Amino acid sequence: LRTLLITDLHLNARVPGLLDAQCESILKIFNNEKPDEGIIMGDVFMYRKPSPSELLSFKKILDNIKLSTDATYVLRGNHDSETKADDGVTSLSLFEDLTNDVKIINHTWVDKIRRRVFIPHYENEETIISALEMVPKEFTVFGHFGYDGCFNSAGDADFGIPLSNFTSTTFLGHIHGFREGQGGLPDAHTRVVCLGTPYTTNFGECFKDSFYAVLSDNVVGHEPPKIEFKKVNHGPRHLVYPISKIEDNLETINDPNYFTFLRVMVGADHAPIPYEKLDVAYIDVKYAPIFNEEEVSSYNPDRDLFSINEMIISDYVESANSTLSTDRLMEGYRLLKNED
């Protein structure tokens, strides 16, 4: 049995042409692989309140997938949830069709027959940890969340779920870049894979490799599925080049297999951009920084340029709106100061 695994489609109709390019890329993957079933691990939509065009495009994707697969499973991602209430309310429920084997996973669901656990996104990480703790031995987990040590697509938010909580092979959406960790005990060799998006979604992801996965397993036996990661070589992508490198990379930039967002970094020399040689969907022009890090002063004074003394602290405490007395607050301040 072959299962195609893909995640974080982020269907977006706000950029003209992008939604069609996304749908075309996703359907090309399914049509090329012809899997027995598909699993979409969340963030189908870019925005919590998808537009009619985005809803209809996902219906088109599912209708095409159903022609060649026996079942499709779709997890609720954070972008698919109406609010952050963890109540499971999502527009994805519109696509539930058990007669044609489309199952929407709003809350944690265990498939005992296929030995799988599906965990959608929850804002409360304790809910996710509790679900991971209940995973039966040798079951495969599919989820939409991160783990301690990996960051979101903006690179500014870590997650608090330790890898030690992952005791079974796990595939995750939510993280846009491909990465793999080891869960459970050191000698368990439990794979925890963040699959990443099948295409880039912003310039911060420029030049990243995008993947989907194909799992091949025996329905009757209990052996772990065989995993094959496949690189996507079409669809939306973001590229960033300094203007001096445009001419040398025209073949890459103009590759017709991609719907390309090109950012051109312009320096102080204001060299002309060869627009007539570019065949891309969008061009974004941005000025490069005037100074690099080496040109910025690294001055670090040895003495305090400003300090807060006892008088300032005392005046601040006396003005504080607190039921504690000034003497009591100052006593606490001195204890903290002595502790330092």
Predicted regions and their residues:
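Active-site environment of divalent metal-dependent phosphoester hydrolases
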Residues: 10-14, 46-49, 73-86, 123-126, ...
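N-terminal active-site segment of His-dependent metallophosphoesterases
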Residues: 1-63, 67-68, 130-138, 339-340
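Conserved beta-sheet core of the metallophosphoesterase superfamily
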Residues: 151-225, 230
